[in-house]
C-alpha cells in the first residue's frame, strides 16, 4: 500500500527489527519529529518478524493506516481541506476526511546496504512536504540523493514543478544527486496511441 507518512528505512545496531510509529496527533504540538525521537515513549512500536513474509506484510501495512476525522480536527493538525480534492483532502458524503494515523515512521531492518549506513526516506507526496517543514528545511537539503517520482499517466503538474523548483532542485539546494523518475510508464501503451504519440508524450514530460 502507498506510504501515508514520511518513512525512514534504516538499520540501527543493538535494536531489534521493528517499526516505530509517531501518532499524527503530535502535530498539534510545537515539537519536531527530531525532538520526538528523544522520547521513545511517544512512539508506538510494532515488532518485525523477518523470518515470516506474512508477519512482515502485516506489520508494514501499519504504516499506511488511515482514519476518518472531522474537517476541523484535520485542519488543526495542518491538513489542507479542498472540496475538489486537488490541493487538499476531499470531504466525503458525511463531511469527514481521511488522514494518516501516523506522522512519521522509522523502520529498523537488517539489510547489508542499510547496515553500511544507507538511510532511505520515503515521503507520501506533496501534502507531507507542505505539512512537515523538517522535510524541506533539513532532511531534503541534506540528502545525498533524491528520487523525484512522477506518474507518467497523469503528467507533470504545476504542483510537481513547484516542489521540484523550490525544494528539490532549486538554486539554493545542491544540484548533484537529484533525479526525476517517470513511473507507470507502461500505462501509456494503451493500444490507442501510436508509438510516435507515446514517444512525444514521454518527451513532453521529460
PLM regions: where:
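Globular "head" domains of long coiled-coil molecular machines
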Residues: 1-206
Amino acid at each position: 500500500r502507498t506510504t501515508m507518512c514520511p518513512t525512514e528505512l534504516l538499520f540501527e545496531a543493538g535494536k531489534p527489527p521493528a517499526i516505530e510509529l509517531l501518532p499524527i496527533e503530535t502535530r498539534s504540538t510545537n515539537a519536531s519529529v527530531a525532538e520526538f525521537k528523544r522520547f521513545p515513549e511517544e512512539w508506538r512500536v510494532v515488532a518485525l518478524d523477518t523470518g515470516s513474509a506474512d508477519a512482515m506484510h502485516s506489520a508494514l501495512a501499519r504504516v499506511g493506516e488511515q482514519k476518518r476525522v472531522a474537517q476541523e480536527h484535520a485542519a488543526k493538525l495542518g491538513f489542507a481541506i479542498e472540496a475538489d480534492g486537488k490541493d487538499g483532502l476531499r470531504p466525503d458524503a458525511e463531511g469527514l476526511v481521511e488522514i494518516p494515523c501516523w506522522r512519521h515512521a522509522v523502520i529498523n531492518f537488517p539489510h547489508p546496504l542499510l547496515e553500511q549506513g544507507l538511510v532511505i526516506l520515503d515521503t507520501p507526496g506533496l501534502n507531507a512536504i507542505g505539512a512537515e517543514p523538517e522535510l524541506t528545511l533539513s532532511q531534503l537539503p541534506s540528502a545525498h540523493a533524491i528520487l523525484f517520482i512522477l506518474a507518467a499517466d497523469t503528467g507533470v503538474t504545476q504542483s510537481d514543478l513547484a516542489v521540484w523548483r523550490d525544494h528539490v532542485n532549486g538554486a539554493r539546494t545542491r544540484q548533484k544527486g537529484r533525479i526525476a523518475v517517470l513511473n507507470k510508464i507502461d500505462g501509456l501503451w494503451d493500444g490507442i496511441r501510436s508509438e510516435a504519440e507515446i514517444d512525444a508524450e514521454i518527451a513532453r514530460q521529460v
